[in-house]
């Protein structure tokens, strides 16, 4: 052993005579820490002296192993190794860099209860995790990770030091030696289990708790109380000024079972640490984020999107509209009554091949008997992009309302080939053909202002939509003639009554649904008393096994309500 010490001393440029002690920082049972000044370089170093005279050869071999280990560890967040040897008095002298900032324990005392900013704590945590992960990847455990061994070279940087107990882990014989019991002692060591990588994670969690709360995680007046608190994980709550993310990460590191604690590598992949990892030195690419981190919807991004050329802007607007439509279909799948159409507006209307296109009814004005269908074009700018559920009032004059049926027929018969058409208004009898969802939208959007002009929209399959409307009208008239009833022409007051009842078919609250079902049963009972079984069958057909669509349900329900109201008024 003495020959190895002499060989080790010959390899070094300086000897102990080139240093003189400035002050003694700490004194322990088997080691002491000093601040020394190098006479030639005029530079301060931290010296750790381990007394080996009263120890066995095994402990001396451990000291030599530690010095060899220190020489191989090179990381920006580990205290820089300077020199080491064994002197003639069997003292292992280990020289490391000295930092004027002191250690974390002194920084907490100097703060005097003033909490550190959360950004700084996250930055320290990221650097400490990088240091611990570097040690673990080299099969090294620190075994003495406390705030006194976390040094502050700069305000926002930390380094791990004091590897007096660090050892290479032997897979066949795990490390089980610990010295004393401290506030950061892990539960598995108290149960005489081997000290492993997860034990360092526990100690790091205790350090982060102390940095955050300015007090130890586990504190008791006696040793029995301390062991009881550690085993039961009894901790005071962290200050409320810190985010739940930081608190959760500290709690994860302080889980009692080692298998439930995350590794340093897993903690480094936490999204909250990504911005701080980007500022670290010599960062491994595995910890870099896949996508660059930037604020969402920042003013710069909005300005860039608004300044896109016309072609890209139109494509983006149409893409956003399609996404909105898909989200609405997923939100209201029961009321979605249309299929995806593949026909183009530039092709004839006969090329639809039976595919249905969406034709939404936007707004109903209760003061008149007209219904206006409107929709925004894809050429509108991003600022004018409005949710498709938002509707508009009809602004036709009374003179225009009288000519509504003719305008409607002309639109659906003569202008079906056009790309951009001015959609007219639908007669009052076609209200029953509208899906309940659209009618409900009309009821819930009454507070919106009325626009002053109509909006031109592209419709690819107007002919098919007109066919549906015509079929619904024929179906209504045929059913009424079969019952020897006359055609009913809605007035404004009757329109409001019908709409208020049809609205209950939508997806409202449970009370409104119960009222609608009660109204349905009352009408069915009235039809049975009047022996109108055909109308009763038509009313109940949508609720059988061969149920029809919501559109047909609205048609039959409206027809029954109107005919019943007329008969009641006649009697």
Swiss-Prot record:
May be involved in plant development processes. The keyword Kinase applies. It catalyses: L-seryl-[protein] + ATP = O-phospho-L-seryl-[protein] + ADP + H(+); L-threonyl-[protein] + ATP = O-phospho-L-threonyl-[protein] + ADP + H(+). Residues 312-321 have a biased composition (Basic and acidic residues). The active site is at residue 144. Residues 19-277 form the Protein kinase domain. Transmembrane segments: none annotated. Residues 298-321, 338-363 are annotated as: Disordered. PANTHER family: SERINE/THREONINE-PROTEIN KINASE NEK, SERINE_THREONINE-PROTEIN KINASE NEK7. Residues 342-351 have a biased composition (Low complexity). Keywords: ATP-binding, Kinase, Nucleotide-binding, Serine/threonine-protein kinase, Transferase. SUPFAM superfamilies: Protein kinase-like (PK-like) (SSF56112). Its EC number is 2.7.11.34. The lineage of its organism: Eukaryota, Viridiplantae, Streptophyta, Embryophyta, Tracheophyta. This is Serine/threonine-protein kinase Nek7. GO terms for molecular function: ATP binding; protein serine kinase activity; protein serine/threonine kinase activity. Belongs to the protein kinase superfamily. NEK Ser/Thr protein kinase family. NIMA subfamily. It comes from Arabidopsis thaliana. It holds the Pfam family Pkinase. The keyword Transcription does not apply. ATP binds at residues 25-33, 48.
